[in-house]
Amino acid sequence: MSYGRIGVIGAMDSELAALIAALAQPAQETVQGLVFHTGRLGVREVVLVRCGIGKVSAARCTQVLIDRFAPGAVINTGIAGGLAGGLAVGDIVVADGLVQHDFDAAPIGFVRGCVCMGDPGAPTVFAPDAV
């Protein structure tokens, strides 16, 4: 299966610096204040962009990336705000479920992490797309 161009987002410059430095045929384009770095990593055409910290920044940046560059897949790289013990720098983590750990609707009867859909007594877990 081929995904064509791949989009890669990272919250901070340090999360993208090595990838940007490795780009062949690099170019830059600014869209809505976001600096997109285009080029090739190996045989793959890529678009790299720093989105800023937080899920709203990531969502906004991802939508601009999709609208302007139409990547076949989007990868989020970086530290991902790791909360699990036992992880070391350089470990690769692949999610099998996504929870908004910072969402708290407890004042209206939902447990922390529940986004007011489904069971109000359990966090809402979103399954990632299979690759």
Label the model's feature ranges.
Residues 70-75:
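Proline-aspartate-enriched helix->loop->beta-strand connector
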Residues 83-131:
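Mid-sequence, gly/pro-rich, charge-dense loop/helix-turn segments that line enzyme active sites
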Residues 2, 6-9, 31, 82-84, ...:
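Homeobox/homeodomain signature
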Residues 15-17, 81-84:
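Short, active-site-adjacent cap segments at secondary-structure transitions
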Residues 1-69:
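N-terminal short beta-loop-beta anion/metal-coordinating cradle
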